[in-house]
Amino acid sequence: MTDKLNDLFSRNREWAAEMERTRPGFFTGLANQQKPQYMWIGCSDSRVPANEIIGLAPGEIFVHRNVANVVVHSDLNALSTIQFAVERLKVRHIMVVGHYGCSGVQAALEGARIGLADNWLRHIQDVRDRHRDILDVIPEHGKAAALCELNAIEQVVNVAQSTVLQDAWAAGQDVTLHGWVYGCLLYTSPSPRD
């Protein structure tokens, strides 16, 4: 194995030892059951780590990530994850979290061709086209940030319209949706736009 991979294992051992030192029995409890109250639907971007951003430990948040935090009704991966979170784990809050500086959103805004992912980014281009009247009056330097916000809102709507959430709400289950956009340059927690 390469030194870089060995370094990952070393870091994991250090992290696990620190967790056990500061929270004795943490891993025993974690091995038995997860009971998160939160689900995070976010971007795959390595700069946007769900647990670290909101200060939650493993087991406290259920996470689904993809390029540009997209939720579409044909994505069985996302829908299955949402269903598991809502029906099995009984999460109380689902946060759809976009982030400023999202490369996927930028590529969709520009209409850039990047390969297979173009098919995925088409969903964000649909958001762009649906809100063209808003984006057209925004200065060029602010369009990507605005599209990040619009995309987060549209994905919240998609989650809300899913059969999973519709059935949960019809059954009286208490699940709240939130749309957030995280700013890496702000060094702060997400600003809620519920």
Annotate the PLM regions.
Residues 125-181:
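Polyanion-binding loop/helix "lid" in catalytic or ligand-binding cores
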Residues 1-72, 76:
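Short, conserved "active-site rim" segments that organize catalytic pockets and cofactor/ligand binding
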Residues 24-28, 80-83, 163-164:
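A generic local structural motif
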Residues 43, 99-100, 180-182:
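Short, well-ordered beta-to-alpha junction loops that form the rim of enzyme active sites
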Residues 187-194:
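Conserved small/polar residues in nucleotide/adenosyl-binding loops
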Residues 3, 52, 57-144, 154:
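Short HxH-centered metal-ligating active-site micro-motif
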Residues 12, 40, 96, 179, ...:
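Divalent metal-coordination and catalytic microenvironments
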